């Protein structure tokens, strides 16, 4: 089978499975889909890797930055729309806030402050996603639904990449070549 046909069939299959999951699930909020997108992104290579964008670790990938920025902004907007009590949540989790503040402070003495700051930003987006999850009516059901959607995306596309697009689906040890 030609790789393009396999990609088309896999994409159609994933869309059908996601549609079935959407209809069967009682979790239909937009936040659960944002969480699913973020989970799918977090568990795979970056978007830049699939687009063959050669970047250094210091500069990162522009599509990845834009994706994370978009997900973070949409998450913040949803939290504001829901009236999420961020101040109260931060007060109840003082130790977590202290760890985040320490991580931000560590940017000052890091060997590569730009990389450290970007990684801190990713942790902040993780916090936004957690707040989205706990602001849902049924957080446990929402998490299961978002995780299912991410798996429905991962599994078929992983098989597709391994079988038809080996350059993206297989990686060898850079030190031994195995």
Language model segments and positions:
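Amphipathic alpha-helical interaction segments
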Residues: 83, 111-112, 131
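Alpha-helical transmembrane segments of multi-pass membrane proteins
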Residues: 9, 95-99, 120-131
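Membrane-interfacial helix-loop-helix modules of multi-pass inner-membrane proteins that assemble, modify
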Residues: 44-57, 105-119, 141-149, 153-178
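Transmembrane signal-anchor hairpin modules in multi-pass inner-membrane enzymes, especially those
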Residues: 1-104, 138-149
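Residues at structural and domain junctions
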Residues: 23, 103-106, 119, 129-132
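Transmembrane alpha-helical segments
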Residues: 72-76, 125-137, 155
